[in-house]
Amino acid sequence: VSTILLRALLDVLQQRGVAPEALLGCSLEALFLELGERALPIARFQALLARAIALTDEPALGLLCGLYASDASFGLMAPLTSCAPTLRHALAVVTQFQPLLVDGVRIRLTESMGIARLRCDLTGCDPLARSFVELIVAGLVRMLRAFGC
């Protein structure tokens, strides 16, 4: 998982009055120094997400992360989609570059008989899968809103 999604989670926690150190057990600088340019293992991100849900007592935290985190929390995805000339192009950008944010997720657009369906599949299933998919889908909803949908 890209550290960008961790920043989104930390943004929402700070909005709810929870310090990053309470979630991480160390300073934010120490964590990013440890990770460097590497991605955060998905199991570690899910453990942090579970801890964040417990700290905030908010079961829909993944949804809130996707809806209320700053645009900067989504890294290059926000400016790439905002520069797309059409929604179809923006969705193509998302499907092309989403592996940079998280492995194990497949986003696809299918169109049939005038109906467009956007699907987000998460490989593997565990109790936190719902929160994780909610985070991703909420980010997609933000993009749809930017296109007036």
PLM-predicted stretches and their roles:
Residues 119-131:
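A short interface-forming secondary-structure element
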